[in-house]
Regions:
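Asp-based, Mg2+/Mn2+-dependent phosphohydrolase catalytic module
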Residues: 1-11, 107, 123, 127-224
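N-terminal helical cap/lid subdomain that shapes the substrate entry/recognition surface
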Residues: 3-103, 111
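Proline-centered loop/turn at the N-terminus of a beta-strand
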Residues: 114-116, 191
Length: 224
């Protein structure tokens, strides 16, 4: 599959692993946890094992969230997670990491295309990420996990974002690092671009039907 570049009139971005370097942040935390146990795996680096563990966890966790969504239990699960998050929240809000080249990419793209965020994150942390890097002015719409009745991999947030931008879904490009992003985009009728800056693998993204795959999100500037 290849992208139909002239068809693209708007670009929709996932956050974690696409704009935000969340995956390396999680891997770094797990690596610090694993380092004292390095005698268990002396021939392998803690960083490599941390990344593989998170990759192994990501697909099942997406499946569980999709099931909760389908059973109309996602709102209840979200309230529980919010309560736990508030109970454990540090006095200083966490600082986010951003994928290399993303700021320049977005500052260039938003003058040529309407842009939107389509994330499975909660609204508070999504907006905090955008504000930390002064990216909010780049986006005409922000869809989070609670914006629509169903979240990714259902098409609802992609369709919602397209409506907010005033662009038909088939003229949108959904950019993300997991099969959940690709499935959501395809089911909405949008073109899809998989990026390898997160934990989705090239083979997974191709099987899901991504129209194009790039090593990094910043590489999109070379395509459009």
């Amino acid at each position: 599959m290849t992208l139909d570049i002239p068809r693209i009139q708007a670009v929709l971005f996932d956050v974690d692993g696409t704009l935000s370097d969340t995956d390396d942040q999680w891997a770094g935390r797990m690596e610090r946890f694993l380092r004292p146990m390095r005698y268990i795996f002396p021939d392998r680096s803690a960083h490599l094992i941390a990344r593989r563990l998170i990759m192994a966890f990501e697909t099942p966790s997406n499946s569980v969230y999709t099931l909760l969504d389908r059973l109309s239990l996602d709102a209840d699960a979200f309230r529980v997670l919010q309560w736990v998050s508030r109970a454990r929240r540090p006095k200083t809000p966490p600082q986010f990491w951003i994928c290399p080249g993303v700021i320049d990419l977005l500052e260039g793209l938003h003058t040529r295309f309407p842009l939107a965020v389509v994330s499975a994150r909660d609204e508070t942390s999504t907006l905090r990420f955008l504000d930390q890097f002064h990216l909010s002015p780049c986006f005409g719409a922000v869809a989070t996990s609670q914006t629509c009745r169903y979240t990714k991999p259902f098409p609802d947030p992609v369709l919602w974002a397209a409506r907010q931008l005033g662009v038909a879904p088939e003229h949108c490009l959904m950019v993300g690092d997991t099969t959940v992003d690709v499935r959501a985009g395809r089911s909405a009728g949008a073109q899809t671009l998989g990026v390898l800056s997160g934990f989705g693998t090239e083979s997974e993204l191709r099987r899901a039907g991504a129209d194009e795959i790039l090593p990094t999100t910043a590489g999109l500037s070379l395509l459009i």
